[in-house]
């Protein structure tokens, strides 16, 4: 996953 646009704890 690049940039993690769906994880609030990137």
From Swiss-Prot:
The cysteines joined by S-S bonds are 4-10
Task: Keywords in alphabetical order, please.
Answer: Amidation, D-amino acid, Disulfide bond, Hydroxylation, Ion channel impairing toxin, Neurotoxin, Secreted, Toxin
One cellular-component annotation, GO: extracellular region
- Annotated positions of the 4-hydroxyproline modification: 5
Which residues are recorded with the post-translational modification D-tryptophan?
6
Localization recorded for this chain is:
Secreted
**According to its UniProt record, in which tissues is this protein expressed?**
Expressed by the venom duct.
The reply on keyword Secreted is yes
Name the predominant localization: secreted
- Under the GO molecular function aspect, what terms does this record hold? ion channel regulator activity; toxin activity
The chain residues annotated with the modification Cysteine amide are 10
Q: What else is known?
A: Exists in two forms, due to cis-trans isomerization at 4-Cys-hydroxyPro-5.
Query: Can you quote the domain comment?
Result: The cysteine framework is C-C.
Q: State what this protein does.
A: Its target is unknown, but this toxin may modulate voltage-activated calcium channels (Cav) or calcium-dependent potassium channels (KCa).
User: Which family does the record assign?
Assistant: Belongs to the O2 superfamily. Contryphan family.
The protein in question is named Contryphan-Bt
Q: Which organism is it from?
A: Conus betulinus
Classification of source organism: Eukaryota, Metazoa, Spiralia, Lophotrochozoa, Mollusca
């Amino acid at each position: 996953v690049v940039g993690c646009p769906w994880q609030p704890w990137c």
